[in-house]
UniProtKB/Swiss-Prot annotation:
Residues cleaved off as propeptide: 20-21
One BP annotation, GO: defense response to insect
Positions annotated with a glycan in the UniProt record: 28, 32
Family classification: Belongs to the drosocin family.
Phenotype for residue 39 to K: No loss of translation inhibition activity
UniProt key word Secreted: yes
Factors inducing expression: By bacterial infection and LPS. In 3rd instar larvae and both male and female adults expression is detectable between 1 and 16 hours after immune challenge, peaking at 6 hours.
Protein name: Drosocin antimicrobial peptides
Keyword Secreted annotated: yes
Free-text tissue specificity from the UniProt record: Constitutively expressed in the calyx and oviduct of the genital tract of fertilised egg-laying females, but not virgin females. Not expressed in male genital tract. Inducibly expressed in the fat body.
Effect the entry attributes to changing residue 22 to A/K/T: No significant impact on translation inhibition efficiency
């Protein structure tokens, strides 16, 4: 008798688990793959600007 009740409870739990649709994945407002490339690109542009400014500026003339 106990085995039958336990088996029926397990069958009900399994049936409910199969019948419910899968939960949607939790929505993350900031996906992990998005902010990093923009930051890296921005840093690369800033470094490039700094290098071009350094290349345009003539080197200082040091006294011999």
């Amino acid at each position: 008798m106990k085995f039958t009740i336990v088996f029926l409870l397990l069958a009900c739990v399994f049936a409910m688990g199969v019948a419910t649709p899968g939960k949607p994945r939790p929505y993350s407002p900031r996906p992990t793959s998005h902010p990093r490339p923009i930051r890296v690109r921005r840093e690369a542009l800033a470094i490039e600007d700094h290098l071009t400014q350094a290349a345009i500026r003539p080197p200082p003339i040091l006294p011999a």
